[in-house]
């Protein structure tokens, strides 16, 4: 899946993701860099309204994104990005919405 394909699919389902609590969604990793292979997963992180997201809601967002993209996803909140990698991830991420 190309970067543009992933972004297009996610944007078409922006309302669904927002209903689940996603305020802003970002693509990073191999798909964002245009280096994804057929077996690559899609890496995403998102911002959400504080106090509105628990484990079950996070799983709902992950399942929705995987269904939209038709492939495995690694999805996390911005707050859960590894502190040693956060600056690099944020600098190279592509904002989806």
Predicted regions and their residues:
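General secondary-structure edge motif
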Residues: 44-45, 69
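Catalytic core of pol beta-like nucleotidyltransferases
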Residues: 1-24, 32-38, 50-97
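Short hydrophobic/aromatic beta-strand micro-patches
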Residues: 28, 45-47
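A short, structured beta-strand/loop element
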Residues: 38-39, 44
């Amino acid at each position: 899946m190309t970067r543009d394909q992933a972004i297009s699919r996610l944007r078409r389902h922006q309302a669904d993701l927002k209903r689940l609590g996603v305020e802003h969604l970002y693509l990073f990793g191999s798909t964002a860099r245009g280096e994804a292979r057929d077996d690559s997963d899609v890496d995403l992180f998102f911002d959400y309204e504080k106090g509105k997201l628990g484990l079950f809601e996070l799983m709902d967002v992950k399942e929705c994104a995987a269904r939209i993209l038709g492939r495995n996803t690694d999805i996390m909140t911005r707050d859960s990005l590894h502190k040693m990698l956060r600056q690099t991830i944020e600098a190279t991420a592509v904002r989806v919405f």
